[in-house]
Amino acid sequence: MEENSKKDHRALLNQGEEDELEVFGYRDHNVRKAFCLVASVLTCGGLLLVFYWRPQWRVWANCIPCPLQEADTVLLRTTDEFQRYMRKKVFCLYLSTLKFPVSKKWEESLVADRHSVINQALIKPELKLRCMEVQKIRYVWNDLEKRFQKVGLLEDSNSCSDIHQTFGLGLTSEEQEVRRLVCGPNAIEVEIQPIWKLLVKQVLNPFYVFQAFTLTLWLSQGYIEYSVAIIILTVISIVLSVYDLRQQSVKLHNLVEDHNKVQVTIIVKDKGLEELESRLLVPGDILILPGKFSLPCDAVLIDGSCVVNEGMLTGESIPVTKTPLPQMENTMPWKCHSLEDYRKHVLFCGTEVIQVKPSGQGPVRAVVLQTGYNTAKGDLVRSILYPRPLNFKLYSDAFKFIVFLACLGVMGFFYALGVYMYHGVPPKDTVTMALILLTVTVPPVLPAALTIGNVYAQKRLKKKKIFCISPQRINMCGQINLVCFDKTGTLTEDGLDLWGTVPTADNCFQEAHSFASGQAVPWSPLCAAMASCHSLILLNGTIQGDPLDLKMFEGTAWKMEDCIVDSCKFGTSVSNIIKPGPKASKSPVEAIITLCQFPFSSSLQRMSVIAQLAGENHFHVYMKGAPEMVARFCRSETVPKNFPQELRSYTVQGFRVIALAHKTLKMGNLSEVEHLAREKVESELTFLGLLIMENRLKKETKLVLKELSEARIRTVMITGDNLQTAITVAKNSEMIPPGSQVIIVEADEPEEFVPASVTWQLVENQETGPGKKEIYMHTGNSSTPRGEGGSCYHFAMSGKSYQVIFQHFNSLLPKILVNGTVFARMSPGQKSSLIEEFQKLNYYVGMCGDGANDCGALKAAHAGISLSEQEASVASPFTSKTTNIQCVPHLIREGRAALVSSFGVFKYLTMYGIIQFISALLLYWQLQLFGNYQYLMQDVAITLMVCLTMSSTHAYPKLAPYRPAGQLLSPPLLLSIFLNSCFSCIVQISAFLYVKQQPWYCEVYQYSECFLANQSNFSTNVSLERNWTGNATLIPGSILSFETTTLWPITTINYITVAFIFSKGKPFRKPIYTNYIFSFLLLAALGLTIFILFSDFQVIYRGMELIPTITSWRVLILVVALTQFCVAFFVEDSILQNHELWLLIKREFGFYSKSQYRTWQKKLAEDSTWPPINRTDYSGDGKNGFYINGGYESHEQIPKRKLKLGGQPTEQHFWARL
């Protein structure tokens, strides 16, 4: 019973998705609430502040655990490594509030969809639903399944038939009202938060609360000037933060506001058409699509087709054709039926419909799938409102440092209590002085130190047309050691040039037709396929669409006409009408009419159309796509026997190859054709030939890849193109260096009696180029020893092989990835999966792509860079308006500079706190302190200015062959802080003790007598000193002393010293002297300090609360400070920052990197049987118990999650939908 109670107390929300949460049920407890109220009053609101910072404590203090079905409060916890908590209240919706009677009979469904969550969640006879809202999404409690479920969307369990039949005629008015109440409005409302609320949120930040406590303490002790300076800076910081947040809020509000005000037309069951505001739409409504139209929801197309621009979501400005969901008589969920191609049926919220094409049976119709924040645009806005925190070691290390400094402060607190109590100081003053020492160790600007470098880096990136929507990732860019590139449009030019066609006849390839002659393709079925099999549209008299389709169409010299003009002539509702142009080859065909289109998809690697030649009664099917894929759908007798060799002869030269196929449909009825399934259309085709296109490297590609290679940054190609083409491009770009071996990894799925297999195939002839062909060795079940150069090898594989290895040879995957360079024919889901696998090997991964099919991978990478002409693409954290890969080294350079700057500022502020802590400990021993203006100069004139300008040093123009340290807790950094702390401690203690040994030294309160007694030992400016020292008693005795006079210039120069030595330039930043403002400030601070030290002006000494000393003592102070500078600089520059020395130490003591990829590289380097060459290995999951190659199975590898072979893609978030 108790176990069931515990089980009912907890459930998972969004199980298996990226935003998965644990939910715990709680019930308010009046006695506990009363105790918390009393405690809040007694602590003057302090407890409420703690509850604000820790919502889980509030729930635990005020509530008692209970089953979720009885809970009135829920506690939510993220399942990621951050374990963040949220508190939400459960509320009830009562259907009795509706204007019409609602059925109270148990057997009657509330909505037409009997499997709807609404039906299952309804509590009868009260007719209520228990709900909660989490990050703008509404959930209802499903008592049958004992969990909260989303509302505001149609269930994925609906089949194609369900969507057409259940929702095809629209919803009744009553069902619409029920859904509106339960699902909420179809609105993406971003509140413009009032300024007072933003101010309160900023002020209640723990950092500002600590700062307020510190400033209150300092003001109470008369530190007016410094406190006022900090208050002014804090107010400016808060105002700027509030202004920035307010502006972001306004921009986001304006971005989504128009979405909520669209007028739409829907079909209401038994009533017909009805116009209403888009915020009243509910899942299941039938939406009528007019011409140009901005979509206010996600909807699935059920009748007609349309062309949409999805640039707002993906950064891809190419129009995308959407086709209706087929009517299939099966119970399979519609997304599973359509596989990854389901996106071709879905219209996403926020995209623009630019053209509609009715089917001839009425207007273009779509069923509303998701509304409000459940939509694609809603997901995007939520990702901005609730960004996922970054798991970067730097930030966790920084927190540990702050905790360490706070512990020092606590030790200082008890030290001060002991000293002041020992001297008999009143308790009030004792506690006050102890608290002051507590605040010394944690500088108020410390939390902001890690972001200052990012601000400067972001500005410099913007000048280079690289825009950033996630500044926290800039530091991560400094750690990148592997960059993945898409091929087409990234490494190679966007545009493809036509090289020629290779037609087939009688099962043989014919002579190639070259486009270099300027002649169009002669009329043939191949020409008809090139003219009709594409997704081009005519928009405002201009043909628009995919660049490949445009080039192919231009090669025919045919033209496209507006379908509306000629639709009557051909007697049918058509998509496109294509006619021969003036320069086209002579054709017996007057026109080609495309009637139906099965769009291209990355996962399917093909597209096809159903067309009709003018004057004919039957129809034709034309297909184009990846040659290997198209050949699979053709009759074997029509595919030339030398097809693989012919294909390879072009792909090894870097050509892009497209295959075309055709068949005739013996049907005379258009309605029969329109309802044909894609599987039936795309079968038994005749192979027509190959279309050869050139895809040239961008001129910047080779230079950038060389620069990354010299910086020892791995480069990998992830593309949807042919494997041979990808390998050739990798070689031509020198991603695969000359002389390296290429091993193709080809894996096959298990069959009935044969287990999964993986074949290792060596590409023999490495010298390739135009006119040269590669030779492949015979593959057998034997191992071939490595030849010369075997230590430099690169694996290449296709997406299909990657998927098989992922499932059946998982232990092989890391071994392949550490040397994998080319991954071809990869689907969007596989690209994201590959990025995640690289990250599991502890690589810091960058991804550069065009932002369309790569959006999932761009989001998954540590630094995703989208090449887009838009200023900021939401497909990735970084967007480059310069559409070549030069942005990659720029970003890495700035990331390294920002990371080093953050470390430098952090080290400086840590040393600042320690130096001040040491001097405070020494002075507290004699109940003394530095004066207000002494602190003011150190804290404002030096420290604050250093923090603001230290990070503005530009990045070094050349990438170093190693990365900066990525951890604050690394040995060089810890040693740097430790040794500098020791230097400071030794110098300060020595000076503190040595000044007491001087013959002219005396206690502060004896100063005047002391001066007269030791007059002969002072400097010659006796008369000047005598004129003002008599008033020394006006200065508080706890400040004016020889100890403060000695320690202040030493510590001040020490601050300048650590600021200088922590501002190292090369190899990651330019030299310090190039940072003019910072250099000037350091020199000015040093000059001012020396001037004050040696000046004999009464106004200066009175103002700075110093005692004049003999010149030799001042010279000694300066010599000591400069000696400390020299020692600290030598240690920092020649030892701690000496990369070669640390490598030598690591080798001598046997220290190795703990990164997984380093471990695997070391293991494989010692394995004489790796890499396997020209052999086949089998998995152990076959029925006949095949041999497993034990050399490649590692028990150290943790089994990873499996890819779904026939199901949905691995991403569960918004990007998977795109």
Curated annotation (Swiss-Prot):
Entries under Pfam families matching the protein: Cation_ATPase, Cation_ATPase_N, E1-E2_ATPase, P5-ATPase
Does the record bear ATP-binding in its keywords? yes
Q: Where in the cell is it found?
A: Membrane
Residue numbers annotated as active site: 486
At which residues is glycosylation annotated?
540, 669, 819
Q: What family, per the record? A: Belongs to the cation transport ATPase (P-type) (TC 3.A.3) family. Type V subfamily.
SUPFAM superfamilies reported for this sequence: Calcium ATPase, transduction domain A, Calcium ATPase, transmembrane domain M, HAD-like, Metal cation-transporting ATPase, ATP-binding domain N
Task: Supply the alphabetized keyword list.
Answer: ATP-binding, Glycoprotein, Magnesium, Membrane, Metal-binding, Nucleotide-binding, Translocase, Transmembrane, Transmembrane helix
Q: Which PANTHER family match?
A: CATION-TRANSPORTING ATPASE 13A5-RELATED, CATION-TRANSPORTING ATPASE-RELATED
| One BP term from GO | intracellular calcium ion homeostasis
- Native source organism of the sequence: Homo sapiens
- Protein's name in the database: Probable cation-transporting ATPase 13A5
NCBIfam families (alphabetical): ATPase_P-type, P-ATPase-V
- Which terms does the record give in the GO molecular function aspect? ATP binding; ATP hydrolysis activity; ATPase-coupled monoatomic cation transmembrane transporter activity; metal ion binding; P-type ion transporter activity; polyamine transmembrane transporter activity
Where does this protein hold Mg(2+)? 850, 854
Transmembrane domains' residue ranges: 33-53, 222-242, 401-421, 433-453, 903-923, 940-956, 973-993, 1042-1062, 1077-1097, 1115-1135
The reaction(s) this protein catalyses: ATP + H2O = ADP + phosphate + H(+)
The EC number on file is 7.2.2.-
Q: Name one GO cellular component term.
A: plasma membrane
Which InterPro entries does the entry mention?
Answer: ATPase_P-typ_cation-transptr_N, ATPase_P-typ_cyto_dom_N, ATPase_P-typ_P_site, ATPase_P-typ_TM_dom_sf, ATPase_P-typ_transduc_dom_A_sf, HAD-like_sf, HAD_sf, P-type_TPase_V
Fetch the CDD domains from UniProt.
Answer: P-type_ATPase_cation
Q: Where primarily located?
A: membrane
Lipid bilayer topology: Multi-pass membrane protein
Q: Which Gene3D superfamilies match?
A: Calcium-transporting ATPase, cytoplasmic domain N, Calcium-transporting ATPase, cytoplasmic transduction domain A, Calcium-transporting ATPase, transmembrane domain, HAD superfamily/HAD-like
